[in-house]
Structure formats: C-alpha cells, structure tokens
Design a protein with these regions (language model features):
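ABC ATPase NBD coupling module
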Residues: 79-95, 125, 199
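Catalytic Walker B motif of ABC-type/P-loop ATPase nucleotide-binding domains
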Residues: 173-176
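Conserved ABC ATPase signature
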Residues: 148-152, 156-158
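Helix-to-loop junction immediately C-terminal to a conserved catalytic motif
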Residues: 62
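Conserved ABC transporter NBD signature motif
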Residues: 70-78
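Helix N-cap at the start of a conserved alpha-helix in ABC-type nucleotide-binding domains
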Residues: 184-186
Length: 207
C-alpha cells in the first residue's frame, strides 16, 4: 500500500453488525471488494442509494465499525489492526462531520471549539484563542463566537460542525451527508467551504 495516501483500501468487505469493536463476529455484508485511494487535497464524493453502505464505510474509516476483510489504512493507521485503545489517537488526526451536527447545545460557538481543543491536548490558552479565531474566520463565523447553537441557522450550525472538524488541522475530513438537512443555498455554501478546505491541502471524503 502507498503510505503517501491519506486513505487506501484494497479488496475491502465491510460488515455491519450494529456493534462496536468490542464485538469481533461478522454481521451483515454491506459492501464487498471496495478499492479506494485518496491523496492529499482531494475531494471524494461517495454516491449510492439510501442504505447502500456509504455511512458504514465512513464509520469503518473512523474506527466505529471494524474492518475484518481486505487491507485498509487511514492517516497511517492500519484499520485491520486498529485496537480500541488507539481509536482516540486516530480521531485526533481526522475530522468528522455528521448530518445532525452533534454540537454541545449548552455552550456557545467559542466554547464548542474550546472544549474539543482541550479534550485533544491543547493547553496554552493564547494558542487556543488564536486557533479558534483562525478557524471561525475560515468558516465565516468570526462574528458569531458567543452565539449559542440554537441562535444559529442550519447552515451556520453545520459550519460550526466543520470548524470543529478542522480545528486540529486534520489530514482528512469524513463527512456523512453534511448537506442532507440544508436548503439548497446553505448546501451550496457548505460545498464552497469544502472547496476552500481542500485547496488548503486537506482531503475530504463525503457521502
């Protein structure tokens, strides 16, 4: 496998059992013989009907669903050998964006990002504030840092979710239907933002 690739899958079959890595038996086959190669600064769009396995593939890439068949690597982690104790280290190197945002509803925009940064090892408050300012400028929320999530539009909430995903400068972002709940104008804004992020060298795989 080419270690220069941020993601590489060869002959992968993916099973969904509804269980996490604690359960090692195979469940229902949802994808078979998948080959995927993603280099730096690439945007890859997974296309398929509802229930075709797109979300399960993304869950496999971030360690939620175990890979049991084929070869797979993401940001240097071997997915076949990924131990549960190593999943937090993997997720510090990737960004994850969900359709339903999963924001901290009791914290404002700034504190949503501050929480993630403290949880992933940032200690210097000056550096934290500087990085948050940079990221909010990137996603167009620089004048919303003290707004609560319920005060934001759907598109703004998704931009906050993207800010959270990029705050640790990941090599790749995995986005599960990030525009699924948005109106066309807001969805277009998100796609333009993704184009800007990709131009900066980060890869994005989205369904």
């Amino acid at each position: 496998m080419d270690e220069k690739k941020v993601i590489e899958l060869e002959g992968v079959s993916i099973y969904h059992s509804g269980e996490s890595l604690r359960n090692s038996h195979r469940g229902e086959l949802v994808l078979s013989e998948v080959n995927l190669s993603v280099g730096g600064g690439e945007l890859v769009y997974l296309i398929g009907k509802v229930g075709s396995g797109k979300s399960t593939l993304l869950k496999t890439l971030y360690g939620e669903v175990p890979l049991k068949t084929g070869k797979g690597r993401i940001v240097g982690f071997d997915l076949r050998r990924l131990r549960r104790s190593r999943i937090p280290y993997l997720r510090r190197k990737i960004g994850i964006v969900f359709q339903d945002h999963q924001l901290l509803t009791d914290r404002d925009v700034f504190r949503n990002l501050h929480y993630v940064m403290k949880a992933t090892g940032w200690r210097d408050e000056t550096l934290i504030r500087r990085r948050i300012a940079e990221v909010l400028e990137l996603v167009g929320l620089h004048n919303k840092e003290y707004k609560m999530p319920f005060e934001l539009s759907g598109g703004e909430q998704q931009r906050l979710a993207i800010a959270r995903a990029v705050v640790n400068s990941p090599a790749v972002i995995l986005a599960d239907e990030p525009t699924g709940n948005l109106d066309p104008a807001a969805a277009d804004e998100i796609m333009r933002l993704f184009a800007t992020i990709v131009a900066g060298g980060c890869s994005i795989v989205m369904s």
